[in-house]
Amino acid sequence: MRARSLSHTLLPAVFLATAGVWGCSPPAADPPEETAATSAAPPAERGGQETYGPYDLVDNWPKPLPDGPDGVAHAGWTWGSMGSVYAETPDRIWIAMRGELPLPEGAEPWTPYSMLRPPRRSTGNDDGRSATCEPVAPRGWERRYHHVIFVVDGDGNVVQHWAQHDALFDMTCGRGPHKIKMSPYDPDKHVWIIDDQLHVIYKFTYDGELVLTLGTKGQRGRDAGRLFDRPTDIAWLPDGTFFISDGYGGTRVAKFDKDGNFLMDWGQPPVDPKNPGPNEFNTVHSIAIGADRRLFVVDRAHGRFQIFDENGQFLDMFYTGPRGEGDDPGAPGIVSRPYSHLITVDQYLWVSDGGTDRILKYDLDGNYLYGWGGPGGWPGQFQGPHAMTVDQDGNLYTAEVFAGRVQKFRPTPGADPDKLVGQELRWSGSD
C-alpha cells in the first residue's frame, strides 16, 4: 500500500510555557465566539490557553529520592535521564532511570538538568564513550547507578526500590534501562526491562527475581535470540507471543513464543537512505499491537510508522510529520522523531514525538487528529519524551531522556475526553 504523508496536519513545535518566563506578546484580536474558550476551560473564562493540553501539571512530582539504608546519600545529586515509566495502577508507577546525576556547585537540590543554568542534557553514555563504545570527548560529569528501578505512589513517594539490581546496569559502555513494561495478558505481572546499550532483555517476577535473559550482555549483533543490537521495546499477543523492536542497530523486529523461544525476524537497513522503502528501518524504537493483531512499529529516524501482520507481512506505513531540514545523516530531511506510542483500549494511536516534543493522536489508519505540547526544559514542556503511560484514573505520565525527569499530568476538569490519552490495555484479573 502507498505511504500516506501527514505533514500538512502537524502543528508547529513552538510552545510558550509562562509569560513570566518568556515575556508577553501584544494582545491579539478577539477570536470568533465559537473558538473563544478551549474545551478544557470554564466557558466564562477570558483569555488563557491549553498550556498542557487537556491536563493540569502536578507540581513537585515525584518527590525527592530518600537516602537509602545502604548509606547512599543524595546531597548534591539529582534525577538522571529517564528511560521509561509504566503506570501499573494510580498508586504504583514504575520508573526506569539511567542512574543519578551530580549537581554543579550552587544548584538547588533536585533541579532537573534541563533547568540548570546553563542547562545540561541528562542523557549520555559512559563519560568519554560514544553509543558504540568508541572514545569521545568527556562531558565532565558522570552518573551513579542508584535508584535505577523504583516505584512511586500517587503522591510521588518512593514505595519500592530494586536496589539489588542497580549493579545490573553498571557496565562500561552502558547507560541504563530503555524500557520497563508488563504484559497486559500476564496474571503474574512479570516485569520486563530492556537495556539497549548492553543489548539484553530481562524478565523479572513481580517481586524482582530475574527469571529470563534474552541476548548476551555487552555483545551486539543479529543472531536470532542470542544477540541483539540495541533493542528498544516489547509488545505481546494474548497467547504470550511477544515481539522485540531491535532497535538502534538491529533494523529488525524479532518474534518469540511465550517461553522466549525465537520464531522469526524481519527488517533490513534502507537501500537508499533518502528514500526508504517498506520493511527498511533506521532505529526501530517502539512497538505496539492493535486489537486486530496488527503491529505498529516506530521507524524513528525515518519519521514514520510501519504496520505489519503478526508474521511480518508489510501492510502499510505513514509519516508523523514534515520532511524538512533534519540533523540525522542516516535519515536526512526528517523533522518528526516518534519516540514511543500506545494503542489505547478505544483503538487510537498516541505518540510521544521527540523531534517536535509533542503528544500526538492518530486513528489506526494514520490520520492525524490532535496534538499538544512543545519543546523546553520548564515544567510542562518536553525534552525528549521517551515514554508515556496512563493509569486507570486517566493521569498521564511522561519520561524524558534529555530533561532528566518524569512528569505527571492530571486531566483538567471538564476536558474534552477525545483529547485525553485513553486507557492502556492491562491485566485486570477478570479476563
Language model features with spans:
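Bacterial N-terminal signal peptides that target proteins for export
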Residues: 1-11
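C-terminal motif of bacterial Sec signal peptides marking the signal peptidase cleavage site
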Residues: 20-23
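Bacterial signal peptide processing site
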Residues: 25-27
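Eukaryotic scaffold repeat domains enriched in small/polar residues
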Residues: 31-431
